[in-house]
Amino acid sequence: MKIAISMEMTRKLRDTWHAALSHEWYDFLSQHDIIPLSCHGKIPKTDEFDLIIMTGGNDMPDIKTWRDNNYPVRDEYERQLIQQCQLTRTPILGVCRGFHFMNWALGGTHTSMDTPYDSTTVQLSTFEVVCHHSIQIATLAPGFEVVQQDNKGVVELALNKSKRMLGVGWHPERAVNTHTRTYILDLINTL
């Protein structure tokens, strides 16, 4: 499978922006060809890929107004990437921030969590995952269905089969058990 994957934006010395991709992604997708996307420049021809992954990292801007955005270049790039994938019917996997951004870009809403998840282990229906987020889905974008919620009702996995999109609230690339990794890879194959 040929996979394009967005990278997190980081600020280093002298206020210079850098694009970064965790090495865990290479381990998670070791059987596939991975093409990192720096979130700058031209949107790739998405129909040349079997899957686009919008990764985590970078906090979301204000969830009500979408202002105070510290990563406007990444947000605009990923918004255009979603539009292009819809035109070419290229499947998208949104992970953590990627899931929340995808939901927002397609008409869903979010709310702040009373108690943010900071490396918090949460129980899903058949397995546990470790989550890192301070916002949660309030309403899913049209066409998405809840696949997994945690024991507090936080949506951790949603699917839109008609648009070929899967949103995951945790980081499957960091999962230590093979069941969780296999579960996500199997869902990707249904898109």
Region spans (language model):
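Active-site-proximal beta-strand elements of phosphoester/diester hydrolases
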Residues: 129, 166-170
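N-terminal beta1-alpha1 cap of cysteine-dependent amidohydrolase-like domains
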Residues: 1-97, 103-104, 116-123, 134, ...
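Post-Walker A helix-loop "phosphate-sensing" segment adjacent to the P-loop in P-loop NTPases
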Residues: 107-111
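Beta-propeller blade-edge signature
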Residues: 125-127
